[in-house]
Design a protein with these regions (language model features):
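Metal-dependent amide/peptide-bond hydrolase catalytic core
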Residues: 37-197
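Flexible glycine-/small-residue-enriched beta->alpha junction loops
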Residues: 27-41
Length: 197
């Protein structure tokens, strides 16, 4: 690519990506959501502990992570992180979004009763989205009576104009701090676990 950069220069990119219209109509959509991904891990005791001996004593990473996720996203899909709202689309853009997609067809195939916010499919994808894509706690197999040492969640954010990946990161980090968490870029040391609640 670097060797032939001049041959690859262009004024426009066309991507063959996106959902197929259930009516079979060809579609050209102008604009696309960007994406940023991140992972949050909450920590508790240094090792797994018996919940009968340490329930209500040791911080429960899974419960804390669940509260943190709930603080970031409303039931209707809106991101509730301060500063994360995008400029609302114009009436014309909203009308085009409603008319440009077969909402009923887009929802019936994957068996979705309604969009999270009750908007049309097109209006829904015009909004920034925070998706929980992975949750990890405990291990595979039968349920255990244990409080484990950490819980983790993977996320993707569908970005809309005006929200860059860097800005999204800044807003998320500020939100996590405002919820009372200390951010670390590696698993906490024993000393950190003993001093940070």
């Amino acid at each position: 690519l670097d060797l032939h950069r001049d041959l690859l220069a262009s004024d426009l990119w066309l991507f063959g990506d996106g959902p197929i219209d259930p009516r079979g109509l060809p579609r050209v959509s102008l604009g696309a959501c960007g994406i940023a991904t991140f992972r949050l891990t909450t920590y508790g005791p240094a090792t797994s502990l018996h919940s009968g001996h340490y329930g209500n004593v040791a911080p429960n990473p899974a419960a804390r992570l669940a509260h943190l996720i709930a603080s970031m996203r409303a039931d209707d899909g809106r991101i509730t992180i301060n500063g994360f709202s995008a400029d609302p689309p114009s009436q014309r853009s909203r009308a085009l979004a409603r008319e440009g997609f077969d909402t009923e067809g887009m929802l019936s195939g994957p068996a979705i009763a309604e969009t999270e916010a009750g908007l049309s499919y097109g209006e829904s994808i015009m909004r920034p989205a925070l998706n929980v894509t992975q949750l990890t706690y405990g291990g595979a197999g039968p349920q255990r009576n244990a409080i484990d040492s950490q819980a983790s969640a993977g996320f993707d954010i569908r970005l809309t104009p005006g929200i860059t990946p860097q800005r999204a990161r800044e807003l998320i980090e500020a939100h996590v701090r405002n919820q009372g968490y200390t951010l670390v870029d590696a698993p906490p040391t024993l000393e950190q676990r003993r001093s940070i609640s």
